[in-house]
Amino acid sequence: PRSKSLRWICGDEPRLSIRRLVAVDFARPYSSGIAIYDGLTPDEALRVTGTAKTTATICTDSTDEALYMTDIESLKCIVARSNGKAVLSRIICGQSQALAKDTVAVALDYFKNTPNNFNILLHTPETGTWIVSTPERLLDMKLDSGRISTMALAGTMPTPADGLCQWDIKNIREQAIVSDEIIRQLNKAHVQNIRNYTCNVASGAVTHICTHIYGTTASPNAYRELLDILSPTPALGGWPRHTALQLIRKFEKHPRQLYGGYISIEDDKTAQAFVTLRCAHTDNQG
């Protein structure tokens, strides 16, 4: 489906900002292979608004916690045989009078807690309204030079009061697996001069292990090709990818919609895509 109107808030700082685009903006649901918004003109694509409203309703279809934990245990037994992993998601629903009154105000207030994230309030008639705050850049490409960067973001822990993270073996191992898989995919896509470094990245109340990965490509169509290669990320789906996606389709009872997909912003010099990692979906009236 295509949308005739797209309203959003975005930027590295929690404030309204206008982006004049000359190419396309699109969002893709998790593992769908379909771009929801694609080929829109700049005038069609962006509206910065302080009046977007949505009506929050009581949601009665949260994922049952007992069933969710049962599925997790069943999944562990299956993936242990292949030394892999599959990542199940769940839905937590609720009601917010503040959200029903003014979605924009709620989003801006939340974004104050995540100033280093990519923060966006997105609305289309087809998808409803989504509040997204993500630290994860799926892909950044300089279109003139072919320089690309991406990241592996797997290890997670609550941010300690002193800011000094002591990572356990599980987080370190999973970070290495995700990093190695991304680098393997980039090598398959003939990305050259691949290099990386690892650091800690704070995002709100949690801190992640983050491996920044860089390279160069000569392919003129590399941006879209690399998006298809990198998404869904191992941290959101699991590994090996084909097996993990099969297990997710078997065990999950709900569509992920935009969760775990990505949002892309392009202009004539740079193309960037961000994983819709942390997000909340309101109803689609607005």
Task: Name each model-derived stretch.
Residues 1-29:
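An N-terminal JmjN-like helical accessory module and its immediate linker preceding a catalytic domain
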Residues 2, 16, 90, 95-177, ...:
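An anion-binding catalytic pocket shared by soluble metabolic enzymes
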Residues 41-73, 95-96, 149-249:
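Contiguous alpha-helical scaffold segments within structured protein domains
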Residues 84-90, 121-124, 241, 259-260:
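Short coil/turn segments at secondary-structure boundaries
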Residues 124-128, 183, 198-206, 262-267:
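A glycine-rich phosphate-binding loop feature that marks nucleotide/adenosyl-phosphate handling sites
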Residues 237-243, 247-286:
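Glycine-rich, small/acidic residue-mixed loop/short-helix segments
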